């Protein structure tokens, strides 16, 4: 399936139905008076998160969503039927903006979350509402009100606990395939990963966390070079970042520093997230290789996904940091 993480769609709620002009006509009621019913309200447009969706692909092929209008009012004070609401399913993690002003309308991050995005117009009043002491037979009614309409700019930001960041061919895809059930494309050339991959990492019996692998970034990514920039948004919601550098790198700490600099240039709070330096591909490290000293305040773990070296230690540390972030995010109990 093609991965699409941005889309623009037009939504329009239904117009309200027209109020009715009608008069009561019965054999023994010569002056029955007005009995025109009100028009029905137009249908609303809702957005709802669907945990089975992982992309905005559907919106590439369908660009307009129109809710039905309300039915017109009828005689005998019968109101028109309300227009049927329509519900548009989107993936969890969808950020919705007004495409014209780019104002954020909703950030949908919970399962089965719903929000009304466009309200249907009210139905017009029938002539029964306009009778007065001086006008007992009004021939006036109201048209229905217009339903709301707007263009939406939707952006998908994947929901994950751990984000994997590294240069192309740093071993991210192999790592996520070993730690989780994810099966990304893996090959020994740069830019194998062209779309983000999510993997669920099982930890002990009933614990797990979600890991996101994005395409490799290169120096200058924050200015638009390479593939990584357009996918950095997918690690904005992560709790921690694992920065991967291959053991065959000429200068591991310099490469790590470049990755950190790109995260800082991109902004959006990425540089404030807890980080872990992971030295990968220890199975191909030079014979005289020495694991460098970790940068201040940053943990360092050396692993080989192929040989399984260091993988348990890595999983333990990732779980520890994810759990710590979750505890820090919990609201304090009363009295604390």
Curated annotation (Swiss-Prot):
EC number(s) on file: 3.6.5.-
SUPFAM superfamilies: Obg GTP-binding protein N-terminal domain, P-loop containing nucleoside triphosphate hydrolases
A GO term, aspect molecular function: GTP binding
Residue numbers binding GTP: 166-173, 191-195, 213-216, 280-283, 304-306
InterPro entries: G_OBG, GTP-bd, GTP-bd_Obg/CgtA, GTP1-OBG_CS, GTP1_OBG_dom, GTP1_OBG_dom_sf, OBG_GTPase, P-loop_NTPase
Disulfide pattern: none
Skewed-composition ranges (Polar residues): 129-138
HAMAP family, A to Z: GTPase_Obg (MF_01454)
Recorded family membership: Belongs to the TRAFAC class OBG-HflX-like GTPase superfamily. OBG GTPase family.
Protein name (database record): GTPase Obg
Species per Swiss-Prot/TrEMBL record: Chlorobium phaeovibrioides (strain DSM 265 / 1930)
Organism classification: Bacteria, Pseudomonadati, Chlorobiota, Chlorobiia, Chlorobiales
Gene that encodes it: obg
């Amino acid at each position: 399936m093609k991965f699409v993480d941005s889309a623009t769609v037009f939504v329009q709620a239904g117009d309200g139905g027209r109020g009715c002009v009608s008069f009561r006509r019965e054999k023994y009621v010569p002056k029955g008076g007005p009995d025109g019913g009100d028009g029905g309200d137009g249908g609303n447009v809702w957005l709802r998160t669907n945990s089975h969706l992982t992309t905005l692909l559907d919106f590439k092929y369908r660009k307009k969503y129109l809710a039905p209008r309300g039915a017109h009012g009828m005689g005998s004070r019968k109101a028109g039927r309300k227009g049927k609401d329509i519900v548009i399913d989107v993936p969890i993690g969808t950020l919705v903006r007004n495409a014209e002003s780019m104002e954020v309308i909703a950030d949908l991050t919970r399962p089965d979350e719903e929000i009304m995005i466009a309200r249907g117009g009210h139905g017009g009043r029938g002539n029964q509402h306009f009778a007065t002491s001086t006008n007992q037979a009004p021939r006036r009614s109201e048209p229905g009100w217009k339903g709301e309409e707007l263009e939406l700019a939707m952006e998908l930001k994947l929901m994950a606990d751990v984000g994997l960041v590294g240069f192309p061919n740093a071993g991210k895809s192999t790592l996520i395939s070993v730690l989780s059930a994810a099966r990304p494309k893996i090959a020994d050339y740069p830019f194998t990963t062209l779309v983000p991959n999510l993997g669920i990492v099982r930890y002990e019996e009933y614990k797990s966390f979600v890991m996101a692998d994005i395409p490799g970034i290169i120096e200058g990514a924050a200015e638009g070079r390479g593939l990584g920039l357009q996918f950095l948004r997918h690690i904005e919601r992560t709790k921690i970042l694992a920065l991967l550098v291959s053991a065959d790198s000429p200068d591991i700490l310099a490469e790590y520093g470049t990755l950190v600099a790109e995260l800082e240039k991109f902004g959006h709070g990425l540089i404030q997230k807890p980080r872990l330096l992971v030295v990968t591909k220890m199975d191909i490290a030079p014979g005289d290789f020495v694991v460098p000293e970790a940068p201040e305040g940053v943990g360092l773990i050396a692993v080989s996904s192929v040989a399984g070296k260091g993988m348990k230690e890595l999983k333990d540390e990732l779980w520890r940091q994810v759990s710590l972030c979750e505890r820090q995010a919990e609201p304090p109990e009363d009295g604390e």
